């Protein structure tokens, strides 16, 4: 970016602060960053959790990787540079949503550890919870809801994570969920995490 142009940009402070929004909402804001292979259950778990939050009057929003790539990041390929840019853009959007007082659920493969760490640093460690959906690739491939593994195996698509490209599992995720566990059990764990971090009041989903 042109330095002269950058020097003429000034951050506009909002009269309504994040703290005021959180107080009105009755809960704090945070990011749950769901990472895992395609077909691991990221979006399914995030959707199920969002339904619970919504029914309990908690303001949340789910950002799905495919949805973002269909609009905001439709100009990006799956090269390493573009994958990094994709994650950076998502991080910038999430940063604004944090200040809106929301609980943001991000479902995106984000295959590289440095990508996820970049977002953690961008948002601040206290605002970011890395949720690793640990599902064996054999199960992900057997599910294959979008038929992407099949296309990758036959060479119809390239640069597919888990086949042609590496997925780097988190060394120490904030939350570890088994993609083979039930939606209810995984959601209970996430609700407990949010409660233990003083983000929300306790929710009983039994």
Swiss-Prot record:
Q: What class of enzyme is it?
A: transferase
The EC number on file is 2.7.1.25
GO MF, one annotated term: adenylylsulfate kinase activity
PANTHER family in the cross-refs: ADENYLYL-SULFATE KINASE 1, CHLOROPLASTIC, BIFUNCTIONAL 3'-PHOSPHOADENOSINE 5'-PHOSPHOSULFATE SYNTHASE
Its domain of life reads Bacteria
Q: Which family does it belong to?
A: Belongs to the APS kinase family.
Choose any GO biological process term that the UniProt entry carries and state it.
sulfate assimilation
Which pathway does the UniProt entry assign to this protein? Sulfur metabolism; hydrogen sulfide biosynthesis; sulfite from sulfate: step 2/3
Alphabetized, the UniProt keywords read: ATP-binding, Kinase, Nucleotide-binding, Phosphoprotein, Transferase
Q: Where does ATP bind?
A: 36-43
Organism field? Buchnera aphidicola subsp. Acyrthosiphon pisum (strain APS)
Q: Which InterPro entries match?
A: APS_kinase, P-loop_NTPase
| CDD domains listed in its UniProt record | APSK
Q: What is this protein called?
A: Adenylyl-sulfate kinase
